[in-house]
């Protein structure tokens, strides 16, 4: 049965207007992006087929647009629509950090942004957010790229980038492609090294987020960062 013949309260668009987007299933939300069905099936059925064959939703949408375009029921136009929707979400989350408020006062927004930016990456990516003395965002950079289970991290380069941006503080993040966000012993060790290296140039490490499935793990929230140490001379 075509969607326009469904009861009005069950049609995805009308349901969203009446009850909000959280009331829709993954297939119904995806159907709104598709607009119409494929191969004699309506948009919701087509969305369910895509999720069953190529899902779940995150796995499907993490594919590059060119790969999405080759899937039955998508094609170039629909794959571009999905890619544009994801980029809008990315920019919305980035805007939470870029409108002048102190990033250090909004760890939830930082975690959401980093999760969206790093989750689903096939290889480890190590990035840094550079902040001014009021903890406002100056720049966000991907610094190192690695393999499926490791990324080389060079403290000297992190310090160099912090000085280049005249940063007063830094938030670090990397992903675990395995999906497990629990910090490894290597994560803890390199975080300690980076914190010490940054402290030598009076740059404070505010946090280190590890991104996987679910909520990112925050070193600061876990109490895994060393307390700032006074610099002694003499």
Swiss-Prot record:
Transmembrane segments: none
GO terms of biological process kind: proteolysis
Keyword Iron-sulfur among UniProt keywords: no
UniProt xrefs under CDD domains: MPN_DUF2466
Residues bound to Zn(2+): 174, 176, 187
Positions of the MPN domain: 103-225
Protein name per Swiss-Prot or TrEMBL: UPF0758 protein Smlt0399
């Amino acid at each position: 049965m075509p969607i326009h013949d469904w009861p009005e309260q069950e049609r995805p668009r009308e349901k969203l207007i009446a009850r909000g987007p959280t009331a829709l299933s993954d297939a119904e939300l995806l159907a709104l992006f598709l607009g119409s069905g494929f191969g004699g099936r309506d948009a919701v059925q087509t969305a369910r087929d895509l999720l069953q064959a190529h899902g779940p939703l995150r796995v499907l949408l993490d594919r590059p647009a060119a790969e999405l375009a080759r899937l039955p029921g998508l094609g170039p136009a629909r794959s571009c629509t999905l890619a544009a929707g994801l980029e809008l979400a990315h920019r919305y989350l980035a805007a939470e950090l870029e409108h002048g408020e102190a990033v250090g006062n909004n760890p939830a927004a930082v975690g959401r942004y980093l999760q969206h930016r790093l989750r689903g990456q096939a290889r480890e990516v190590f990035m840094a957010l550079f902040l001014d003395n009021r903890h406002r965002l100056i720049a966000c950079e991907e610094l190192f790229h690695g393999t499926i289970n490791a990324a080389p991290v060079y403290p000297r380069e992190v310090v160099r980038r912090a000085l280049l941006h005249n940063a007063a503080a830094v938030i670090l993040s990397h992903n675990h492609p395995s999906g497990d966000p629990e910090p490894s012993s290597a994560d803890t060790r390199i975080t300690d090294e980076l914190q010490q290296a940054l402290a030598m140039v009076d740059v404070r490490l505010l946090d280190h987020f590890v991104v996987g499935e679910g909520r990112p793990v925050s070193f600061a929230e876990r109490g895994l960062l060393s307390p700032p140490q006074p610099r002694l001379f003499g």
